[in-house]
């Protein structure tokens, strides 16, 4: 019953999955395998196929690093692999939200001027959905509000042992710099957010030539 409520609430507040048509077309079968990315693709597929073991279960040891931190240069397939995992699980009826970092924050901002759910409603969904996929973390505007909101979501999932997948063009130190508010230049919350993600996630690194330049 709790799972059905989560699905219903996420559809009402965020949409079916938050995924646009471009995300929905990205599957493992449409991923272009190369020598540079085949190990990353295999790791992503293993994660999707073994996802049930990533979820916290009553009476079972905490699942440990049950998320993925997918990093690499632009155009190397990070978003495709993250979306392929999401689509694999959605096809099995599992609740998943997959959004860019910018869209995730914009959805929260819309609650300030519309009746489409309150800020707390949206945050609750992001914190409790069985899998949250955040694409392009580090592309959001580096404001105090943005990093505070991102930390709130990541920390909520950390405390609940829920799996989270993020993709980024940056290594951890560059990401901390990108997420540090320009108003204060205080990196404490950005560093705490990335520290949480490093504790929650296994790393997958993509290399090679950008698909977009081929």
Where are the predicted features?
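Short, small-residue-biased leader/transition segments that mark boundaries at the very start
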Residues: 2-7
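Loop/turn-to-beta-strand initiation segments
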Residues: 94-95, 128-131, 160-166
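Pre-Walker A adenine-sensing motif
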Residues: 43-61
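Dynamic helix-loop-helix/coil hinge segments at AAA+ ATPase domain boundaries and subdomain interfaces
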Residues: 14-42
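Short glycine-rich substrate-engagement loop in P-loop NTPases that contacts/grips substrate
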Residues: 40-41, 90, 94-128
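Walker A/P-loop nucleotide-binding motif
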Residues: 58-81
